[in-house]
């Protein structure tokens, strides 16, 4: 190649790289918005459909509380359709579902969020290209099952189940979870040394601060003779316990996320993890 041509190309490449670096926005600890995320949809056994949502809080450190209303609404049918009002930092996959009827057809829902003065919206529907199977991936892996007692019932997948508890602001509230999983390994991968299931607790809604004794409590594996009942053929099962302390009275919703070895967001394939929620009524 002619040296002059090579020099021009090299300078052009350096210029393009410099230009790209100029427009790369650095991460921000705070002051950024929250973007709703449409993960997809899946059919339910009764003929209805579940639309799965997550979000992306673009702040590295700032968690946000956005009450239901003008700054946090899903319409039509809203403003409240079960969405979070507390937003953890960064990307959060498949945090909740909205159920729509079997005749929903080509209609749309729109989730609107206003955070730090920045508005973001996502319109969602039942586009066939966005159909999911959050209960089994291509390798046959299934999400962990979650129960609130050792006897169950046990439910898996993003819709989950709900428990109601009560307490007061001066005493920690005990939180106990039983899990069961098929301990499926990604084909061709080495069996991980980490536990087959990991749990993460977080505040989903509520007026005050929530402090967990451990938001990622270890799961104590149960012996085969004491394994949970009601979850199909568990290879791994166990119990995890923690407590939550609430800064003030009010109605709270806590979320517990159970991940298997596929990790957050199921490597982008929307399987295999499970959610469950605990509604806690806190008195003085």
Per-segment meaning from a language model:
Residues 105-117, 254-256:
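Short, aromatic- and glycine-rich surface loops/edge beta-strands on solvent-exposed regions
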Residues 18-20:
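Boundary at the C-terminal end of the N-terminal hydrophobic targeting segment
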Residues 102-105, 247-249:
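Surface-exposed, short loops/turns at beta-strand junctions within beta-sandwich domains
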Residues 49-55:
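Short, well-ordered beta-strand segments enriched in hydrophobic/aromatic residues
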Residues 13-15:
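N-terminal signal peptide c-region/cleavage motif recognized by signal peptidases
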Residues 1-6:
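Bacterial N-terminal signal peptides that target proteins for export
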Residues 93-99:
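Ligand-binding face of N-terminal immunoglobulin V-set domains in extracellular IgSF glycoproteins
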Residues 22, 28-38, 42-44, 55-57, ...:
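Extracellular/lumenal mature domains of secreted and surface-exposed proteins
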